[in-house]
């Protein structure tokens, strides 16, 4: 079984390459977002990984202030799609606008998964 070697380089090109070539179980760690003040106090942690079904508030960008449920999470792109956050293509079709999870705040957690509940509570 191969081990994941920790990143030791300071070079930006190697930092970027490590992110782009990371396996999916490592990319999951890049999908963290801040918890709202109430959730942070309740669970005793400041952040959690975003999953489908969470309710998030967008904190940065064109859709700042928009709140909606997470439709999908793309580990390959490192983005999430949120209800009500859409772009219109030239032909008129609407597509979900990809959002970086670092630009959102989780306001309500989807707790159907028991393992998630135990991993968030500390």
Swiss-Prot record:
A GO term from the CC aspect: large ribosomal subunit
PROSITE patterns referenced in this protein's UniProt entry, alphabetically: RIBOSOMAL_L24 (PS01108)
GO terms, biological process: translation
InterPro entries on file: KOW, Rib_uL2_dom2, Ribosomal_uL24_CS, Ribosomal_uL24_euk/arc, Ribosomal_uL24_KOW, Translation_prot_SH3-like_sf
This protein's UniProt keywords: Ribonucleoprotein, Ribosomal protein, RNA-binding, rRNA-binding
Keyword Electron transport set for record: no
Stretch forming the signal peptide: none
GO function term, MF aspect, one: structural constituent of ribosome
Keyword RNA-binding carried by entry: yes
Lineage top rank: taxon: Archaea
Biological function: One of two assembly initiator proteins, it binds directly to the 5'-end of the 23S rRNA, where it nucleates assembly of the 50S subunit. Located at the polypeptide exit tunnel on the outside of the subunit.
Family from the record: Belongs to the universal ribosomal protein uL24 family.
NCBIfam families for this protein: rplX_A_E
Subunit structure of this chain's protein: Part of the 50S ribosomal subunit.
Entry protein name: Large ribosomal subunit protein uL24
Organism of provenance: Methanosarcina mazei (strain ATCC BAA-159 / DSM 3647 / Goe1 / Go1 / JCM 11833 / OCM 88) (Methanosarcina frisia)
Organism ancestry: Archaea, Methanobacteriati, Methanobacteriota, Stenosarchaea group, Methanomicrobia
Gene (name only): rpl24
């Amino acid at each position: 079984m191969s081990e994941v070697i920790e990143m030791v380089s300071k070079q930006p090109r190697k930092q970027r390459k490590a992110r782009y070539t990371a396996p999916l179980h490592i990319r999951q760690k890049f999908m963290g977002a801040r918890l709202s003040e109430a959730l942070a106090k309740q669970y005793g942690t400041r952040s959690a990984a975003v999953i489908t079904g969470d309710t998030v508030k967008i904190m940065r960008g064109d859709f700042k202030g928009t709140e909606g449920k997470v439709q999908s999470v793309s580990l390959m792109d490192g983005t999430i799609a949120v209800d009500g956050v859409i772009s219109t293509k030239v032909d008129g079709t609407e597509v979900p606008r990809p959002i970086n999870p670092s630009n959102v705040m989780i306001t309500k957690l989807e707790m159907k998964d028991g393992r998630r509940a135990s991993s968030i509570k500390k």
